[in-house]
Amino acid sequence: MTQIPYIDEALNATVGCSGRDCKCRPTCWAKGDHDKRHKAYLAGKKMPLQYAKPFHEVQFFPERLERALHWKKPRRIGISFTGDLFDEQVPLKWIDDIMAVIAECQQHQFFILTKQVKRMAGMLREYHIHNNTFLGVSICDQEDADTKIPDLLRIPGKHWISIEPMLSPVNLRDYLPIETIGGVEMEPWPFWIVIGAESGPKRRPCPHEWMIAPVEQCQAAQVPVWVKAVSIDGKVVHDINLFPKELQVRQTP
């Protein structure tokens, strides 16, 4: 099981991230959790082996991939959500092992998310991207959108975009099939968009208006959108029933 609500399972075969091009670094939940456990490990407490090393040293645990081979019921599986699968430290052999499991488990859907979309494009050039694979990019603002989404859409396969944490307004119209609101119709376009406010004690504000705009654009384009978390009265809220009506949307591809 996983605490990430839009997937059923997380296979964290890689752990860690170098932090390059990481606007979310101050509040990264994966880094914060790992840092606390790494500190406990160094203090002599009994902890899983992955916490022996700091978060900026990317590690590989290929044995974790075997779980997917034993699940018969179809599941939505996130790959390496406790790091960046296409971090500069990750060798092609690790990618090869992961893609082999994905190819063997056609009953599942696999969701890959990276900030290093150019490296993902280069490393996946020689692979056949199966229909059960969703390749995603993590963005935080319009600069990210305009520099990373075009590179994502050039990779063969299905695509998704995570705007989390959302740190400023993001206009998706140029990347969605919405001629009626000025977008450029293009194919392939994203199959799915996830949007979420920043969490953690150092979180930055995310007004509802920022989130409403891309939600409405996705709805106009009939692209599924999932609103994960909203800032309400200074608190991060995950209960969809407490969201503003315009943001009570949780769709899957």
Where are these regions (language model features)?
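N-terminal [4Fe-4S]-dependent radical SAM core
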Residues: 1-76, 84
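Intrinsic-disorder/low-complexity coil detector
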Residues: 4, 25, 47, 53, ...
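Short linear motifs in intrinsically disordered/low-complexity regions
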Residues: 9, 13, 152, 234, ...
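Conserved AdoMet/S-adenosylmethionine-binding subsite of the radical SAM
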Residues: 59-230
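C-terminal accessory extensions appended to soluble enzyme cores
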Residues: 231-253
